[in-house]
Amino acid sequence: MDLIVNGEPKQVSNEQLHLVLNELGYAGKHFVVELNGEILSKETYTTTKITAADRLEIVSFVGGG
């Protein structure tokens, strides 16, 4: 399935958001997900389905000093 992730086209094989995030390498990381302009709570990741042409923005947190 084709998605737009952080402004770039990506091909993924899953339709469940939590599986898509794992497929994209976000497992175990701290991040926030915006789906089609709406910020999602982490509790909804396992119940949210992705459809073709959805737009995901994934923002990771980076520590620094």
Show the residue positions of the predicted features.
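Ubiquitin-like/PB1-type beta-grasp interaction modules and other compact soluble beta-rich domains
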Residues: 1-64
